[in-house]
Regions:
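N-terminal active-site beta-alpha-beta segment that forms phosphate/nucleotide-binding
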Residues: 1-61
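Conserved phosphate- and dinucleotide-binding cores of soluble alpha/beta proteins
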Residues: 55-175
Length: 175
């Protein structure tokens, strides 16, 4: 699907819901939050004061840092809110994923999450970590500004989630 087709699909599927959105450049690039706000209560991770509220919504939207063709969904998080919301507490979780995040297997998806997505996210957040400054790879730093503090690998939807779905977009989106 294209980004527009994926946005239309989710816009048609989600109506009258409370929706939490984790920090996701992919979702922001699609303008999905703006579409959904027209007929849902959307609590966006990046808007002040919504971090806790987004964790208790009916639906949660986020992306991944790496998606293995063997099925593993990999996310790295600094605060933990985004990864926690993919594991427990929501009726539905949707992972909106650009094709650039695909990797052939678990090891390459994890490598991508650590060495592509995390340095770009650290740069975006203005962190002074080695990966952000050098912009080339993870240094497994111990910086107080480190954004890589939690790692999740999902093989299937956890029992604490009603249902989950990966929406794959045939475009490069996000990090």
């Amino acid at each position: 699907a294209t980004a527009e087709e994926a946005a239309a699909y989710l816009d048609g599927k989600l109506d009258g819901k409370t929706i939490g959105i984790g920090g996701s450049v992919t979702i922001r690039e699609m303008g999905l939050d703006q579409r959904l706000e027209k007929h849902n209560q959307v609590l966006w991770h990046w808007k002040h004061g919504t971090l806790q509220d987004a964790a208790s919504t009916q639906v949660y939207l986020t992306s991944v840092n790496g998606l293995a063709e063997t099925g593993e969904l990999i996310n790295i998080d600094g605060t933990g809110n985004r990864v926690a919301s993919t594991i427990f507490g929501h009726e539905e979780v949707y992972f909106i994923v650009g094709v650039n995040k695909l990797a052939p297997d678990y090891d390459k998806a994890l490598w991508r999450a650590r060495n592509v997505a995390s340095p770009k996210n650290a740069q975006r957040l203005g962190k002074q970590t080695p990966c952000a400054v050098k912009a080339d790879k993870c240094y497994d730093c111990k910086s107080p500004e480190r954004i890589c503090r939690a790692l999740t690998v999902l093989w299937e939807a956890p029992k604490g989630i009603g249902r989950s779905e990966v929406v794959l977009i045939d475009q490069e989106l996000g990090f």
